[in-house]
Amino acid sequence: MTNIRKSHPLMKIVNHSLIDLPAPSNISAWWNFGSLLGLCLGIQIITGLFLAMHYTSDTLTAFSSVTHICRDVNYGWIIRYLHANGASMFFICLFLHVGRGIYYGSYTYSETWNIGILLLFAVMATAFMGYVLPWGQMSFWGATVITNLLSAIPYIGTDLVQWIWGGFSVDKATLTRFFAFHFILPFIIAALVMVHLLFLHETGSNNPTGIISDADKIPFHPYYTIKDALGFLLLTALLLTLVLFSPDLLGDPDNYTPANPLNTPPHIKPEWYFLFAYAILRSIPNKLGGVLALVLSIAILAVMPLLHTSKQRSMMFRPISQCLFWVLVADLLTLTWIGGQPVEHPFIIIGQLASFLYFSLILILMPTCSLIENKLLKW
């Protein structure tokens, strides 16, 4: 008799994805972030569901409903902080996951990579709308500033912004629709994750060497299930440490002040994980140019498979490319720092140089460097 996990229609899918899946024998801890992202999504959906049971999406009661969750609901405070800090963990894992893809050349699986970029956009949209829901000062002004950027689109811009707002300013209609979208998007993300995995399992995983590993595969279970379980344990420990010891470390104090359309905060800035893109947006003096740069800062990832000029897939044996990769990492950290600073000298010029370097590295320096390394192979 055939084993039920190999014959049952539903169990068969799970078996081929998580148990009998042939995996490269040498994938490192950098390959753990895919499963960690799945864990983050699960945590966000569960905590978000419980928060939605007590939250009211009305401008008059939204702020006090969040206060009510923290003060009166059983363990409401931990659910709220798990959700808020879970988003930070989500983005840490996302950035590391994308960084791994760039370093080891995983972007050459272009379908998987492109679905990943769509996922990144979807998660960023979800996080932005979620930040608006508590209806604090930074929620309101963040929503006003970011949605206002769409007015830079020629001809239809102003109408588009008012259509999104549902009126002539960010108000009750905006909050209600943002709540609706914030609730539905994680389920769309979950569906996209399935497509992402479908395409990944068509080709199989890449590995640190970038060399085809068909000759040396091991079953996913027990080797990588145990490895993922360790990752889960470490991520959960880190998240709980953050939630239980310094839950407001990554938040903005302004968001503990109820939204007031008549009082603008001195420094409007998004959550830390958007600061790099915000710095790129601010580095361009023109409004439309800034919006384009903002979108391109993520969309530029889509051209990476086209700009892969190296004869080797991974950067493991390419020291010059490795240097440029770490310059890119340092540049993104610089942009993140600049995004949180006021718009004044010397931060303006640092932001402009860092933005220029970001696009130059991806579009010009890294592909050129790969060509030089190809020449060095022949020496």
From Swiss-Prot:
Q: Give me the residues that bind heme b b562, please.
A: H83, H182
Chain segments annotated as transmembrane: 33-53, 77-98, 113-133, 178-198, 226-246, 288-308, 320-340, 347-367
Cofactor needs: heme b
Positions annotated to bind a ubiquinone: H201
> Gene Ontology cellular component?
mitochondrial inner membrane; respiratory chain complex III
- Which residues does the record give as heme b b566 binding sites? H97, H196
Explain how, and how many, cofactor molecules are bound.
Binds 2 heme b groups non-covalently.
The record ties this protein, via SUPFAM superfamilies, to: a domain/subunit of cytochrome bc1 complex (Ubiquinol-cytochrome c reductase), Transmembrane di-heme cytochromes
Source taxon at top rank: Eukaryota
Q: Does the keyword Ribosomal protein apply?
A: no
Checking Pfam families in the record gives: Cytochrom_B_C, Cytochrome_B
Give the InterPro entries listed for this entry. Answer: Cyt_b/b6_C (IPR005798), Cyt_b/b6_C_sf (IPR036150), Cyt_b/b6_N (IPR005797), Cytb/b6-like_sf (IPR027387), Cytochrome_b (IPR030689), Cytochrome_b_C_euk/bac (IPR048260), Cytochrome_b_N_euk/bac (IPR048259), Di-haem_cyt_TM (IPR016174)
Q: Which GO terms describe its molecular function?
A: metal ion binding; ubiquinol-cytochrome-c reductase activity
Quote the function comment for this protein: Component of the ubiquinol-cytochrome c reductase complex (complex III or cytochrome b-c1 complex) that is part of the mitochondrial respiratory chain. The b-c1 complex mediates electron transfer from ubiquinol to cytochrome c. Contributes to the generation of a proton gradient across the mitochondrial membrane that is then used for ATP synthesis.
Its family remark reads: Belongs to the cytochrome b family.
More info: Heme 1 (or BL or b562) is low-potential and absorbs at about 562 nm, and heme 2 (or BH or b566) is high-potential and absorbs at about 566 nm.
PANTHER family in the record:
CYTOCHROME B
**UniProt-recorded name of the protein:** Cytochrome b
Q: Which organism is it from?
A: Ochotona nubrica
